[in-house]
């Protein structure tokens, strides 16, 4: 173990300066108030012992017991749960200093910076330094991690105390000194978390010592928090020591933080009222569902119409995922709600007609047509949104590829150009020998060759930067700045190159010998080196392909490149042979010059390393291309798999639509048979849902693989979704229409033959075959059935069959009209006669009579809606059942 030299001191300052002490604060602490020192001794000793007892030991004198560093290291191991280095067991001073330094090293490793605390002061028993060190340990291991609403540790602990004691009288915690002198704050903290331990109402603000002692005794006995404070010291000190109180209060924080004939009449009234109540419930349910659906559409349309592009691929992928969630999770329930809303509306209107009630008119803006219009606007907003997202992702993908390519080429050029200006500015030729000047000239010629070889790269960098600007790359400013710097530097290099050549040519006449081997090496090595750099760039170049043909093209190009490697290796061997010849000449003639080539910056090691790098990159490129080829084959399989399913599902949906359409207009057979057939259709359709789900899964795989086209099918997932939703809506609506016809037939007493006759007449005059007759078709139908109609009579009939003024007559309205005069339905007169029986022939009825004869809820319904009776013989509490009955059938304004 290395010895720790005496005199080593730690000069660290903890980064969290909002609650860690600064060096100047330590200077002031050297003049610590004796009362504060006493409080800190007691508190810090108790705090240390509360942890040391877990290891079966304790301290008596804080500045003496830590001097050898053993218990200090043990304390740190207990509170951190980590092992410290093995202590030195000797008793000499340097052993003690070494142990204390190990403890201080561990504290510093936790990010704590100790100001002016050296191991010598601790070993010497300096009480100020010892207390400061223990306070630093308390801050790091007991207080630092306390955080409330992103506050610092001290502020977080204070805020925690303020919140916990806020409801208590006479408690106002503003600091960690004077706010705790009366002891009520400590008692309030205990009572807030353990009200069974203390009766706060019996505490006396004028007995601070008793309050503090009570709190500390309870904390020690029930909360395992040792006594760390002296009540008399806190009460009698004008400003108690803040560190002592913070240490003690933090123990509370850690302790507490871890811490679902008349009878016949009554039956008739109950039946009528039940129908009315159910109709009102359906009306309210329709209004509620319509409001919720319209509100959802209103909130969704702006989101779908937002075409603001994001700057990053991750953000656009998040938008695409949100849209997928909308199509998979949010929209399908709303499609069902819209369908259910139409079914409820038709059912309600049928029930109202059957029960001889007025037609239901939804509130303004909530008609079925209004909802259909809003839904159409939603579909219009949704159209093209996904295509826009995918186009944006392709654009960003292209941008990222170009940006990475720009960075690679720019980095390569900057690396090459680094230091070139300084080289060109040198005037070494002024003091060089004739041979050296000629060497400098040849070296400059090689540099010019290298410079010309880099011209293409600079042009490529500028072209890529221009394309990034045209595609609106989000970091175009930095790209332009970097490109401009490269171009400016390139211009300076050109100017400096020309000037240096002119200077060298002025001295060329002084040159007598040329080292042909060096010059030949320079001329051949520079292009070869540049070729290798270009080859490495090409081998590391990123590629993006979307088809097997594209990747095959890249593989072909790569194979062509590999075919050139033998020729390149021959060139490399020739260049190496030149250098070997140079070495041979130098050795043969004992020439005292460096074997380094004065005309070229390219070294043999550089050529070897780059050649090795090229050979390493070739198989890596092979693997990348083969992996991409495999991925493109997988994408092609996904396309074919999706197309096979879509080409089967699309015609199946169309066939089902045609079968349902034929079933809805058939004349022969009973309605129940037609219903059973439709139910079978519905069952088959529901069972077919698994095919749609599987297609959705394949479609998601295609999108996750970023496959953007599929030449194997004309069906897209959007076509299938729209067809499937239309099929579900059509079968549900058709079943509802047949159920309504059965309900009307049974309620009106129509035979199956009559129903078939009505259907035949309706189908004959339904010229557009859309289940509706306009006014002229309806008039022709009535005339064909023997009705002699004038304009007034026809207008009256139209108000019955087209109450909403839509200009069309449905099959259900046609049946209602044909059976209206002969059907056995209840009337207002029948209900009035029933009420008269319950009222014992009186023109009014009393609430008591209603409660006696009717069920409680329907009796209360009548009492709430019947107007007071004011006719002859009226008595207090008399109710007008005549007006009420007329209102039920829309014959009054009640």
Curated annotation (Swiss-Prot):
Binding residue positions for Ca(2+) 2: 802, 804, 808
Post-translational modification: Ubiquitinated by FBXL22, leading to proteasomal degradation.
Chief location of this protein within or outside the cell: cytoplasm
Keyword Cytoplasm among UniProt keywords: yes
Ranges of residues in domain EF-hand: 753-788, 789-824
Record-linked InterPro entries: Actinin_actin-bd_CS, CH_dom, CH_dom_sf, EF-hand-dom_pair, EF-hand_Ca_insen, EF_hand_dom, Spectrin/alpha-actinin, Spectrin_repeat
Region (Actin-binding) location: 1-254
Cellular localization per UniProt: Cytoplasm, Myofibril, Sarcomere, Z line
One GO term of the biological process aspect: regulation of membrane potential
Spectrin repeats (start-end): 281-391, 401-506, 516-627, 637-740
Modified residues (Phosphothreonine): 237
GO-annotated cellular components: cortical actin cytoskeleton; filopodium; focal adhesion; glutamatergic synapse; postsynaptic actin cytoskeleton; postsynaptic density membrane; postsynaptic density, intracellular component; sarcomere
Pfam family, one: CH
Domain Calponin-homology (CH): 38-142, 151-257
UniProt keyword list: Actin-binding, Calcium, Cytoplasm, Metal-binding, Phosphoprotein, Repeat, Ubl conjugation
Annotated residues for binding of Ca(2+) 1: 766, 770, 777
One GO molecular-function entry: protein-macromolecule adaptor activity
Subunit structure, as described in the record: Homodimer; antiparallel. Also forms heterodimers with ACTN3. Interacts with ADAM12, MYOZ1, MYOZ2 and MYOZ3. Interacts via its C-terminal region with the LDB3 PDZ domain. Interacts with XIRP2. Interacts with DST (via N-terminus). Interacts with PARVB. Interacts with SYNPO2.
PANTHER family associated with the record: SPECTRIN/FILAMIN RELATED CYTOSKELETAL PROTEIN
Family stated for the protein in its record: Belongs to the alpha-actinin family.
Cited function: F-actin cross-linking protein which is thought to anchor actin to a variety of intracellular structures. This is a bundling protein.
Entry protein name: Alpha-actinin-2
Species, as recorded: Mus musculus (Mouse)
């Amino acid at each position: 173990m290395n010895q720790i030299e005496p005199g080593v001191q730690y000069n660290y300052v903890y980064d969290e300066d909002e609650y860690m002490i600064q060096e100047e604060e330590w200077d002031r602490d050297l003049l610590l108030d004796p009362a504060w020192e006493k409080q800190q001794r007691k508190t810090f000793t108790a705090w240390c012992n509360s942890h040391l007892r877990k290891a079966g030991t304790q301290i008596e004198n804080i500045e003496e017991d830590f001097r050898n560093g053993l218990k200090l290291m043990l304390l740190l191991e207990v509170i951190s749960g980590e092992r410290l280095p093995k202590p030195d067991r000797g008793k000499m001073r340097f052993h003690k200093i070494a142990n204390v330094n190990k403890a201080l090293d561990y504290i510093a490793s936790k990010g704590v910076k100790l100001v002016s605390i050296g191991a010598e002061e601790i070993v010497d028993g300096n009480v100020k330094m010892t207390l400061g060190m223990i306070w630093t340990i308390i801050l790091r291991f007991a207080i630092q991690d306390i955080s409330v609403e992103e506050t610092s540790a001290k502020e977080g602990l204070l805020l925690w105390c303020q919140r916990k004691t806020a409801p208590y009288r006479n408690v106002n915690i503003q600091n960690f000194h004077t706010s705790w002198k009366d002891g009520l704050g400590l008692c309030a903290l205990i009572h807030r978390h353990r009200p069974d331990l203390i009766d706060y109402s019996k505490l006396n603000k004028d007995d601070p010592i008793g309050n503090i002692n009570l709190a500390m005794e309870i904390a020690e006995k029930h909360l395992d928090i040792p006594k760390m404070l002296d009540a008399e010291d806190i009460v009698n000190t004008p400003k108690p020591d803040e560190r002592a109180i913070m240490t003690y209060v933090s123990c509370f924080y850690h302790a507490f933080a871890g811490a679902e004939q008349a009878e016949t009449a009554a039956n008739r009234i109950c039946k009528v009222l039940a129908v009315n109540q159910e109709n009102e419930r359906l009306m309210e349910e329709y209004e509620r569902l319509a409001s919720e659906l319209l509100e959802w559409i209103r909130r969704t349309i702006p989101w779908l119409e937002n075409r603001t592009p994001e700057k990053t691929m991750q953000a656009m992928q998040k938008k695409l995922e949100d849209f997928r969630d909308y199509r998979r999770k949010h929209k399908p329930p709303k499609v069902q709600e819209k369908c259910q809303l139409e079914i409820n509306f038709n059912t309600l209107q049928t029930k109202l007609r059957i029960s001889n009630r007025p037609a239901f008119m939804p509130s303004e803006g909530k008609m079925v047509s209004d909802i259909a219009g809003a839904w159409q606007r939603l579909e219009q907003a949704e159209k093209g949104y996904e295509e826009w997202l995918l186009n944006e992702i392709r654009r960003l993908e292209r941008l990222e590829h170009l940006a990475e390519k720009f960075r690679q080429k720019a980095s390569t050029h900057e690396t090459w150009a680094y230091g070139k200006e300084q080289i060109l500015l040198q005037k070494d030729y002024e003091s060089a020998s004739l041979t050296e000047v000629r060497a400098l000239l040849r070296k400059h010629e090689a540099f010019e060759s290298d410079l010309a070889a880099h011209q293409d790269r600079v042009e490529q960098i500028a072209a890529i930067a221009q394309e990034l600007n045209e595609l609106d790359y989000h970091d175009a400013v930095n790209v332009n700045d970097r490109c401009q710097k490269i171009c400016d530097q390139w211009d300076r290099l050109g100017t400096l190159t020309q000037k240096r050549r002119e200077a060298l040519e002025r001295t060329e006449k002084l040159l007598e010998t040329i080292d042909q081997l060096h010059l030949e090496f320079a001329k051949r090595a520079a292009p070869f080196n540049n070729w290798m750099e270009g080859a490495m760039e090409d081998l590391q170049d990123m590629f993006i392909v979307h088809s097997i043909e594209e990747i095959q093209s890249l593989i072909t190009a790569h194979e062509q490149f590999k075919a050139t490697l033998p020729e390149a290796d021959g060139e490399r061997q020739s260049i190496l042979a030149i250098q070997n010849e140079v070495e041979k000449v130098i050795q043969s003639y004992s020439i005292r010059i460096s074997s380094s080539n004065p005309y070229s910056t390219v070294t043999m090691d550089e050529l070897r390393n780059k050649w090795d790098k090229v050979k390493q990159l070739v198989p890596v490129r092979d693997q990348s291309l083969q992996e991409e080829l495999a991925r493109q084959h997988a994408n092609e399989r996904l396309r074919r798999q999706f197309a096979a399913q879509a080409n089967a599902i699309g015609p199946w949906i169309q066939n089902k639509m045609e079968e349902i359409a034929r079933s809805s207009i058939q004349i022969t057979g009973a309605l129940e048979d037609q219903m059973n057939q439709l139910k079978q259709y519905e069952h088959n359709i529901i069972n077919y849902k698994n095919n749609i789900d599987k297609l959705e899964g394949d479609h998601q795989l295609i999108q996750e693989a970023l496959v953007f086209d599929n030449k194997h099918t004309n069906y897209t997932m959007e076509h299938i979704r729209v067809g499937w939703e239309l099929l579900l809506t059509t079968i549900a609506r058709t079943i509802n229409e047949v159920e309504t016809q059965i309900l009307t037939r049974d309620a009106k007493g129509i035979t199956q033959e009559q129903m078939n006759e009505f259907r035949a007449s309706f189908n004959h005059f339904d010229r557009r075959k859309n289940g509706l007759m306009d006014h002229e078709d309806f008039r022709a139908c009535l005339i064909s059935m023997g009705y002699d109609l004038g304009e007034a009579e026809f207008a009256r009939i139209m108000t019955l069959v087209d109450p909403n003024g839509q200009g069309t007559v449905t099959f259900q309205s046609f049946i209602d009209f044909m059976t209206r005069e002969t059907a056995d339905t209840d009337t207002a007169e029948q209900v009035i006669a029933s009420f008269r029986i319950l009222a014992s022939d009186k023109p009014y009825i009393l609430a008591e009579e209603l409660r006696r004869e009717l069920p409680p809820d329907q009796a209360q319904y009548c009492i709430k809606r019947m107007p007071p009776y004011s006719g002859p013989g009226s008595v207090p509490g008399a109710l007008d059942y005549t007006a009420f009955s007329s209102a039920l059938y829309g014959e009054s304004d009640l």
